[in-house]
Swiss-Prot record:
Protein name: Acidic leucine-rich nuclear phosphoprotein 32 family member B
Gene3D superfamilies: Ribonuclease Inhibitor (3.80.10.10)
Quaternary organization: Interacts with histones H3 and H4. Interacts with KLF5; this interaction induces promoter region-specific histone incorporation and inhibition of histone acetylation by ANP32B.
Function statement: Multifunctional protein that is involved in the regulation of many processes including cell proliferation, apoptosis, cell cycle progression or transcription. Regulates the proliferation of neuronal stem cells, differentiation of leukemic cells and progression from G1 to S phase of the cell cycle. As negative regulator of caspase-3-dependent apoptosis, may act as an antagonist of ANP32A in regulating tissue homeostasis. Exhibits histone chaperone properties, able to recruit histones to certain promoters, thus regulating the transcription of specific genes.
Note: Suppression of the expression of this gene by RNAi induces apoptosis.
Domain of life: Eukaryota
Keywords for this protein: Chaperone, Leucine-rich repeat, Nucleus, Phosphoprotein, Repeat
Gene Ontology BP, a term: nucleosome assembly
Modified residues (Phosphoserine): 164, 171
Amino acid sequence: MDMKRRIHLELRNRTPAAVQELVLDNCKANDGKIEGLTDEFVNLEFLSLINVGLFSVSDLPKLPKLKKLELSENRIFGGLDRLAEELPSLTHLNLSGNNLKDISTLEPLKRLDCLKSLDLFGCEVTNRSDYRETVFRLLPQLSYLDGYDREDQEAPDSDVEVDSVEEAPDSDGEVDGVDKEEEDEEGEDEEEEEDEDGEEEEDEDEEDEDEDEDVEGEDDEDEVSGEEEEFGHDGEVDEDEEDEDEDEDEEEEESGKGEKRKRETDDEGEDD
């Protein structure tokens, strides 16, 4: 697929001004030149032209907001002054795997004041013994060359890689709706866990109350049983006492009757 056709498909019914990221990797650049890319892409921040067969960047339009440009695995041998003229905001440039042989071909990059990272892996220029020292001296604005700083410390991913399309935060400070949905889901999960914990605590409280009631019920039954036993025992004692009282009364009556008969007999003797 040629570059023009690819750009048309990538637009997806959008206007060029609405595009912030454009990936044209592996499409065909006729005559080794950039085609179909115009200065209407005023908000483009990331452009990738990996392995498209470019010989030069002389047809690159002005892209005032472009920050990252991927040009690796092409056949570019010079003409980098075009980059300095058209890409004032460029911070990351990847020229790995091109036909750059001399340090002098990099001199136009001195005018890219914002350039922080440059990659030249696989270019013949890297074969020089003093390659790194020379490039850092030529381009003092650079922080990283081939992924390492002047002290040979590897660059953090956040410095080497720049997201081409940085999504703007919404009014709530969220990058997009996805983060917000994830937070909502996490909040729901936490609420469900809290509800489950609350239900478990309620169940435990109910079980404790039931156990307390059972214990109290048993104590009440024991008290009632004790009272009944005591009452029964007292009842038996009372009955025995009543029987004894009746026997005593009968004895007294019989004793009284005996005395009466004796008096009557004595009286009869006196009469005789």
